[in-house]
Amino acid sequence: MLTARRPSHTLDMRSVSIPFWLRGNYDAMTFFGSIVTHSQAEAERYNQLTPQYQSSKLPAQSSKLKEWYHPVKYHETIHLRQAQSVHNSWLCFYWKYFLFWFQARRANRILPNAGYELNPFEMEAYANMYNPYYLDRFPDGRATGWKDYARMTLAQRFYARRKYSPKENS
């Protein structure tokens, strides 16, 4: 984990169990190309999933879809593709993530976890984590849907977030 490669060099995000890193209701966290989980059992389950992220490589049967798809791992994979779209750098991705988080904290009086729930990166990931073909929309594999959310005002993001609910989806 401490010798992270560029996001474009990461084909499959390995999962590790570091339970004290995750607070609250978070199921997992992306950390420089790895997925941090609550338990070793979750980490092993995510590590057993086959890394196939292009629908052209996927079998048509839904039973085969279960061999590689899990919403939480896909959510974290969307973060990997977002990092590729931010100068292909984990540091740039986390810097932008922090800036969006800090900006959204102004809405904490209305929404207790606003820094997280109104973050454009999280909004894109939550809105699309149940669509296993979402990343196919981007020919170069870089998820850029977060840019649409970033152009919105905080009020627009607040109302747009009602289309999904991170607490219900996690």
Placement of each model-derived feature along the sequence:
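Zn2+-dependent metallopeptidase catalytic core
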Residues: L2-R6, H70
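Metalloprotease/metallohydrolase-associated module, dominated by Zn2+-dependent proteases
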Residues: V16-Y26, T30-F32, T37-S39, L91-S170
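Short pre-active-site segment immediately N-terminal to the catalytic Zn-binding motif
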Residues: R23, D27-A28, V36-Y74, Y116-E117
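Activation segment
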Residues: S39, Y46, R81-Q82, M129
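Short, solvent-exposed loop/turn segments at secondary-structure junctions
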Residues: A41-E44, I78, H87-N88, P132-Y134
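Acidic active-site catalytic centers that drive phospho-/nucleotidyl reactions
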Residues: H75-E76, E122
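Catalytic Zn2+-binding segment of zinc metalloproteases
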Residues: E76-W95
